[in-house]
Amino acid sequence: MGFSHGVSKTLKSPKSLSLLRSYYSKFNPYPSIFGLNDHRFGLIKHDYCSNTRKENINPIDLSKYPTERIRNFSIIAHVDHGKSTLADRLLELTGTIKRGHGQPQYLDKLQVERERGITVKAQTATMFHKYNFHGPNIGDAHEPPTFLLNLIDTPGHVDFSYEVSRSLAACQGALLVVDAAQGVQAQTVANFYLAFESNLTVIPVINKIDQPTADPDRVKAQLKSMFDLEPSDCLLTSAKTGQGLEQVLPAVIERIPSPPGYSNSPLRMLLLDSYYDEYKGVICHVAVVDGMLRKGDKISSAATGHSYEILDVGFMHPELTPTGILLTGQVGYVVSGMRSTKEARVGDTLYHSRTSVEPLPGFKPAKHMVFSGLYPADGSDFDALNHAIERLTCNDASVSVTKESSSALGLGFRCGFLGLLHMDVFHQRLEQEYGAHVISTVPTVPYIFEYSDGSKVQVQNPAALPSNPKKRVTASWEPTVVATIIIPSEYVGPVITLCSERRGQQLEYSFIDSQRAFMKYRLPLREIVVDFYNELKSITSGYASFDYEDSEYQEAELVKLDILLNGQPVDAMATIVHNLKAQRVGRELVDKLKKFIDRQMFEITIQAAIGSKVVARETISAMRKNVLAKCYGGDVTRKRKLLEKQKEGKKRMKRVGSVDIPQEAFHELLKVS
């Protein structure tokens, strides 16, 4: 409806329609496809409301683009190396968006992305570009053919590495963008190997050559030494000024192979991503690997087994553009009446319901690596928080949510996230979009404990692990990551010290060039989950670049650390730590709590304990009313009697009184590693 409505406003006259024709003729050498009587795809005629004119709208004929004329590629880069600006320039070069459109980072800031935050993790855009693949034409007898280019824009962050790998599976090539001044960074390394493992053709693009500190020759040498990419293959560009951009699209067409699918095989589509639209429901980004898809087809999901009818199909040019059909090798969107994005699993295979096909390889369900409890700051706001989380998870299927209760914080939710960035953005959106003020508990990672009877249990919430279990814990395991760190060589010493303190194991250590060092460490995920990146930036004056990927579980001596207030454990503050660090972490926790818990009319004892063994203790003295103020001398026994009475009252208060824990205390506990 949105597309039809937009057309009804713009096409007020035949003159406007002719402008649309001339606009598309820039991309398409086949003007016949814009004829008014083309009934092949069922999108010719739209009926509008009484105050608008009836117009005939014709889609682009996708059958004119066999797989030989299709190129699917992605742009991968480290943060701030110019990926989004380069994507903007390519969209402008092909006429997909107008120059000076007033919206920089167009693919990062489509309406759905601006409104949905992290939900639209992969965005696609279809472009048309005329290019003579076999050298210049002699005379004007033949017009150069038009190629259909699908840009699949992916995030660079490690939290979404699975989504990125699925998006790359739909590509045959990638532009590896590197800053001419900063050179190869940690995410450059991670992204290159993701593309390399997917067997993609990698085209190195050295961007920002207009900067005064740019040194393209040094970057070429780095790319050669680290990835064995030939210096002669590198493209030198400046997305900001437009310098060198004219060589990017020809390189994409010449170097990247066409999609390898079979048009006469049964339909197989790879689901790249999805988002929720209030009017259309779930909109899925898909890549057609084999076969073809038409509007009205019945499709099934290999992951869930559910069946759907295709209500709308098309591509992003750059907004939703209905075509009624998608052919082999093409990338676009489908609307199938899904109610929730939880039904749209990233990496899933979609196929015609009447056929049986082999699912595409590589599908994995979402793997949650960080868990945190979310509670309303005001206990009475549980229903409002419940509504906010339901609305948010309707759009972001990668968050797991289960209800839980805490004796200290009341009713709340235990949420699982893909990583730290995912968790931070989720919290931020809850507050910004829904005004939900939440208390979040210390983030934890999934541990595995084995008991003396041989049973194993995965623990996502430390409070669920008994402090004095009836069965003895015989072994425990924690998840680890392989971290890539690139730093200036003068900071090598402090970084090695930091990684050693965080129980890191060095895997690799080399120099990229005379100025920068490359290091790989295996680190427990628990050690980097809170403040490792901040510490790393601090000791390297902000020059470090850091990236990580999930690794296997490793055995570790883990213990549950309880926080007790006046002898009562606070379940929301329990945490699981390594035995060697338990005393230090316990001391830090009780010191923080002493600063943030207000004095009461009775004494408060704060303890950190492992089972029944107390490892750290602090006491907050009681506020004391001067009960002797009214005694002006006289018998000392009168004063003693008043003091004894006060002492008894304090004891009774301590026994029945509750300690109020401010929200700031929970936020401060997040910073204790």
Swiss-Prot record:
| Example of a GO MF term | mitochondrial ribosome binding
Picking any one GO biological process from the record gives:
translation
UniProt keyword annotation of NADP present:
no
**Binding, GTP:** 77-84, 153-157, 207-210
Keywords per UniProt: GTP-binding, Hydrolase, Membrane, Mitochondrion, Mitochondrion inner membrane, Nucleotide-binding, Protein biosynthesis
Per UniProt, residues of the tr-type G domain are 68-260
Listed CDD domains: EF4_II, EF4_III, LepA, lepA_C
Q: Name one GO cellular component term.
A: mitochondrial inner membrane
Give the EC number.
3.6.5.-
**InterPro entries recorded for this chain?**
EF-4 (IPR006297), EFG_III/V (IPR035647), EFG_V-like (IPR000640), G_TR_CS (IPR031157), LepA_C_sf (IPR038363), LepA_CTD (IPR013842), LepA_IV (IPR035654), P-loop_NTPase (IPR027417)
Name the catalysed reactions: GTP + H2O = GDP + phosphate + H(+)
Localization, per the record, is: Mitochondrion inner membrane
Instruction: Name the Pfam families for this protein.
Output: EFG_C, GTP_EFTU, LepA_C
Its membrane topology is listed as: Peripheral membrane protein
Query: What is stated as this protein's family in its record?
Result: Belongs to the TRAFAC class translation factor GTPase superfamily. Classic translation factor GTPase family. LepA subfamily.
Additional comment? This protein may be expected to contain an N-terminal transit peptide but none has been predicted.
Q: Which PANTHER family match?
A: TRANSLATION FACTOR GUF1, MITOCHONDRIAL (PTHR43512:SF7), TRANSLATION FACTOR GUF1-RELATED (PTHR43512)
Q: What does this protein do?
A: Promotes mitochondrial protein synthesis. May act as a fidelity factor of the translation reaction, by catalyzing a one-codon backward translocation of tRNAs on improperly translocated ribosomes. Binds to mitochondrial ribosomes in a GTP-dependent manner.
Q: What is this protein called?
A: Translation factor GUF1 homolog, mitochondrial
Q: What is the source species?
A: Ricinus communis
